[in-house]
Amino acid sequence: MRASELLAPTLRETPAEAEIVSHQLLLRGGFIRKAAAGIYTYLPLGRRVLAKIEQIIREEMDRAGGQEVVLPIIQPAELWQESGRWEVYGEEMFRLQDRHRRQFCLGPTHEEIITALVRSEVTSYKQLPLLLYQIQNKYRDERRPRFGLLRGREFIMKDLYSFDLDQEGLNQSYRKMYQAYSNVFRRCGLDFRPVQADSGAIGGNYSHEFMALATAGEALLVYCRECDYAANVEIAVAKALPMIATENPAPLKEVATPGQKTVAEICTFLEVTPDRLIKTLFYEADGQLIAALVRGDRELNEVKLQNHLGCRHLLLADPERVRKATGAPVGFVGPVGLQGIPLYADLEIPYLVNGVAGANREGYHLVNVNPGRDFNPTAVVDIRQVEAGEPCPQCGAPLAQARGIEVGQVFQLGTKYSGALGANYTDARGQEHPIVMGCYGIGVSRTMAAIVEQCHDDQGIIWPLSVAPYQVVIIPASLKDDGQRQVAEGLYRELAAAGVEVVYDDRDERAGLKFVEADLIGYPLRITVGKRTITSGTVDVKWRSRKEETPLPLEGLSAQIQALLAREMEKYR
């Protein structure tokens, strides 16, 4: 490709809307352009990167036995109503009507439509197992689209669905996909961690997320450096860390704490440490008022609480409802003496001795609160957020914490959708059973952004060779020099004929500008044809990821470049 013919409109300045590195560089490098909030056009360079990522995905899905299909973006409401998710998705779902007033949606995901397909086409055990996948646009009406490709309203995903006879078959499919996903992200050049995860709105009983480590990541994960434990903090297992009792339980006592509502204020006023406080947080679980208890130095994990309760909706309770139920405003409520409100205590709460809690009377707290003596929780469960430095639940070593971008997730769905939509098979004895399903997604456009978040410097993007829009850029220092131009032209034609993806920067621009733009776009290998090419018969070759330049002779140059590329590509096999 000649640069004079390539649509790659670079920007000198960073657009004000771009908050994170990937958004900034993909805009500045001419890879994407904003069409509307959370909706982007992919320009030629961006489309080439996507195509490389998609090809890696296809190769790994096909190797695992997957078959590619294309499912409709517009989906009938009836299927979502059958599964019970039409209302669950709420305002995130784009809904529309046809001219006959029939309801449809723009697919945010494709469990219903793929299950309906298999329901009509698969009837016998002889047709299973089955792996079907697609690469397709998805749509979610995000309340606040941001971070470029990381949280958009239109995005590209790969979905694979497995259909098996039983749980053993699902386990095999899950292991296949887990390995295939590891292969995909390794080949894309990502530093990633598979972590245990919550299954969220898709549902199911077992799930892993594949996290690309990045400071811009919206997800928080903990992992162990000594063993293979890693988990999203939403479900990371917390060990109870008992406090060593240095005193005996003292009589319960009410003390005045006028105007002291926050943990910090109460600790200062009563001269106690935060780990002595019992935070009492009120929620509405599908409308029912409940209370959750954690230590004052801990954060409640709402995902864990919701999973334990098994409720569909979990919302912080309205303060006025709390006042009516307890007789006190938020900040002065506690577990002692509460009537008719279920209490869910974190694992650490029973170990407290002479703790502090609200007295359910405005302006007062209780001191010397002892669980078991002064109140009994409805249940004691793991509902707190895990923090860095805590012991690993598997080996006991200190946990590390990092931020990550979710680029993929795998789910064991079981019979959640096949049962709801009646996707059954008949076994060898003529008995009918629901098909056992798994779901496996990769955010293709998110993966592109995640690569940029990891692979960049102050000058621009540093694409891994496996996903770069072009592998090589040739820059003549001066097009006015006939010798340089002829060498550059000849090398360009020779490399292109050999199948190398090469850009020849033949634009009538300063060499300095071409170097700056080549670094911004992130071509992996740069070949500079300059004065030394004419005087000494060498060109300067430089990897974008390295500082040093290497002179190479013109004789046999094309073969040398191809050998360099082949060796580098071995990293991504």
From Swiss-Prot:
GO terms for biological process: prolyl-tRNA aminoacylation. Keywords: Aminoacyl-tRNA synthetase, ATP-binding, Cytoplasm, Ligase, Nucleotide-binding, Protein biosynthesis. Catalyzes the attachment of proline to tRNA(Pro) in a two-step reaction: proline is first activated by ATP to form Pro-AMP and then transferred to the acceptor end of tRNA(Pro). As ProRS can inadvertently accommodate and process non-cognate amino acids such as alanine and cysteine, to avoid such errors it has two additional distinct editing activities against alanine. One activity is designated as 'pretransfer' editing and involves the tRNA(Pro)-independent hydrolysis of activated Ala-AMP. Consists of three domains: the N-terminal catalytic domain, the editing domain and the C-terminal anticodon-binding domain. PROSITE patterns: AA_TRNA_LIGASE_II. It is an enzyme of class 6 (ligase). It catalyses: tRNA(Pro) + L-proline + ATP = L-prolyl-tRNA(Pro) + AMP + diphosphate. This is Proline--tRNA ligase. Homodimer. The keyword Ligase applies. It comes from Moorella thermoacetica (strain ATCC 39073 / JCM 9320).
